[in-house]
Amino acid sequence: MIANDDEWKGTRARIAYFEDLLAQMRVAARPELFPSMASGYRAEIEKMQWEVLEYLTRHVSQPAPAEVA
C-alpha cells in the first residue's frame, strides 16, 4: 500500500516502466507466446494502478489503512 508521495511517485515510474516493457513485447514477442508473457505484467500494472487510486482518493488527513499480513 502506498503510504506517501515518494512511494506514489515510485509506483508511477514502475507502472510506466512495465507499460514500456509490454509495448516492446507486443512487437518483439512471438504471437503465440505474447499472452503468457504479458499476463504477469498486466496483473502487476493493474495492482499498482489500484494502489495509486486508493492513495489518491484518500484525503491527506486520513491515515493509511493497515496492511493485512
Placement of each model-derived feature along the sequence:
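General nucleic-acid-binding
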Residues: 2, 18, 24, 32-33
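Long amphipathic alpha-helical coiled-coil segments
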Residues: 59-69
